[in-house]
Design a protein with these regions (language model features):
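GNAT-family acyltransferases
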Residues: 1, 5-156
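Conserved acetyl-CoA-binding loop-helix of GNAT-fold acetyltransferases
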Residues: 152, 159-172
């Protein structure tokens, strides 16, 4: 089969608003040795029924796009009371840390770090909606093969099993 190679910088910046179409289906073909899992979408997984999703829900991971900025900012501002305690290095006012410029800086930092194979930043999407982010970071290549994983999810999906499913998909 034919394997498409995407330029990660173009996908995350998405100047023409078409990048989301490239992630409608999971990637196929051999994984890149330096960038396994990025920029790719995962297959959909079915979340079990819960109080949040009585019939369950479909979830997947995909790369961050410029167009995710509005949802990222809105959800993180709404959930300041949950997120601030676990982000102790945040020194500026919460609204300023989640401005349009802050989103752009965040996206550019992750894009650069992903291109250098140091992180794998992905959006958590449930039923086609942005609900959070999961990131593998400080990726160590070679014999050590180590990293950390971090995530946050919007309060609207807390209790639905999203974080364990997202972290399992991210490390898989």
């Amino acid at each position: 089969g034919r394997c498409l190679v995407f330029n990660p910088a173009q996908l995350m910046l998405d100047p023409f608003g078409t990048a989301a179409d490239k992630f409608r289906h999971p990637a196929t073909g051999p994984a890149d040795d330096m960038h396994p899992g990025w920029p790719e979408s995962t297959p959909f997984v079915q979340l079990p029924s819960s109080a949040v999703f009585p019939s369950g829900a479909r979830m997947r991971l995909r790369p961050l796009l410029r167009s995710d900025g509005h949802a990222w900012r809105r959800q993180r501002i709404e959930d300041e009371e949950f997120l601030r305690p676990v982000e102790p290095t945040q020194t500026m006012p919460w609204d300023a840390a989640h401005s349009q410029q802050a989103w752009w800086n965040h996206l550019m930092y992750l894009r650069t770090a992903a291109r250098e194979a140091l992180v794998v930043p992905l959006v958590i999407e449930v039923e086609g909606q942005f609900v959070g982010q999961v990131t593998l970071g400080n990726i160590q290549h070679g014999s050590i093969r180590d990293c950390w994983i971090g995530y946050w999810v919007h309060s609207a999906v807390q209790g639905a099993g999203v974080p364990p499913a997202a972290t399992a998909l991210e490390v898989d």
